[in-house]
Design a protein with these regions (language model features):
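Flexible coil/loop and intrinsically disordered segments
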Residues: 1-215
Length: 215
């Protein structure tokens, strides 16, 4: 229970930057002192909860069109969480694996690329470049790169295997299956879809009042 709470707490903290970095040492010391005589999980959570952002701010952060630009490492964590949540136990993949050069095998891919050929993409896509809905995971970043949407969707490897965005290998790409092109509306709609999946497990229970526990 505590570990699950701490995972949510740090996720929310990184999304909203609340509490601020200069508050963390004091906060953690205060929380630790409450546990010196006896372990009290509820009291520990209460202290952390009082400093945490409201759910509205967490939602606002996920809606940001600069989400990746603001914290690319956090976005990678969110995408991996989303992908793993869509898989059965038999289909789990180690998305944290590294290659023999010490680099991550799976990386964040911009569906609308960071350096697009402008004649191959809708002009309004650039407004959602770093939004959640324009981001996915791939183990073939160099194969996708700055290609058009159609080519990124259907690209194959040297052995003829499907590795594109519509290959079905990445579950969070299911939204793309019936898409022939990609625009800002698609980015917004996919952002909403992914956010809803994420928040099922990452929203805090605002109905819980810990004040009596702390005082």
């Amino acid at each position: 229970n505590l570990l699950n709470y701490l995972e949510k707490w740090f996720m929310a903290r990184h999304l909203t930057n609340t509490p601020a970095s200069n508050r963390l040492d004091e906060l953690f010391i205060s929380a630790t002192k409450t546990q010196l005589k006896a372990y009290d999980e509820k009291k520990l959570i209460a202290i952390l909860q009082k400093e945490m952002s409201q759910n509205e701010r967490i939602c606002e952060a996920l809606d940001s069109i600069t989400l990746y630009e603001d914290n690319s490492a956090l976005v990678r964590y969110i995408l991996i969480y989303l992908e793993q949540s869509q898989r059965t136990a038999e289909n789990q993949v180690d998305f944290w694996a590294i290659n023999n050069k010490g680099r991550p095998i799976w990386s964040v891919e911009h569906i609308y690329p960071q350096n697009p050929k402008t004649n191959e993409w809708s002009n309004d896509c650039k407004d959602g470049l770093h939004a959640l809905g324009n981001l996915t995971l791939t183990a073939y970043n160099s194969n996708l790169s700055n290609r058009s949407f159609d080519k990124k969707a259907k690209v194959k490897d040297e052995n003829g295997n499907d590795i594109g965005l519509k290959s079905g290998n990445v579950k969070i790409n299911d939204y793309l299956q019936d898409k022939d092109d990609w625009g800002f509306d698609d980015i917004q709609n996919r952002s909403k879809q992914l956010k809803e999946v994420f928040l099922k497990n990452y929203l805090f229970d605002d109905t819980v009042n810990f004040d009596d526990t702390v005082n």
